[in-house]
Amino acid sequence: MPDNFSFVIEGRLAGMARPGRSSPLEEDLAFLMVRGIGAIVSMTERPLDEGMVSGFGLRYLHLPVPDFCAPTIQQIEAFLVFLGDADHAGGVVVHCYAGQGRTGTMLACALVHHGMSADEAIRLVRAKRPPSIDTLVQEQIIFDFAALRENVTSHVQGDRHG
C-alpha cells in the first residue's frame, strides 16, 4: 500500500505520498486503479514516469512546487480545471513527497472550491490526513484562494442583480 493514502472525499479526492516512494511505482499505481483513481496530480519537483502512469490508463498533471512552499493561484486554478476534466474518469489523487504540506494545501483548496470556508477545509483535511498543511505560507494561500473565490462570486452575483 502506498504511504499516507486516504480519501478526503470518499471515492473522489484523495491524497498520498509520492507513488513509488517506499514500494515499486507499478504496485502503487495498481493500488490506485483498484481504488477507482483515474488521475494523479503530482506536486513534487521531479515528475513521475509519465509513460508508466499513462500505461496504467491514468491521467496525469505535474504541478511542481518546492517542498514546504505553497502552490500559486495559477497552479490551484490549473488543478481545479484538471479536477473538473477528470470528474468522469474516477477519483483524483494528489501527492507531494510525504503527502502532507503541498498535498494538504491543494486538497483544502479543492474543498474551498466546492463551497467550504478556508477554516473548514483546513480542519477537515487535517482531521482526515494528519498532519497536513505544514507551513503558514501554505495556510495563507488557502485563505487567499478563498478570498479570491468569494470576491469573484460576489462580483458575478452583483453583476446579475445590478
Predicted features and spans:
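Cys-dependent protein tyrosine phosphatase-like superfamily
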Residues: 1-93, 107-162
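Transmembrane helix boundary and interhelical junction motifs in multipass membrane proteins
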Residues: 102-105
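Short cysteine clusters
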Residues: 96
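Conserved G/P- and acidic residue-centered "switch" motifs that form tight phosphate/ATP-binding loops
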Residues: 99
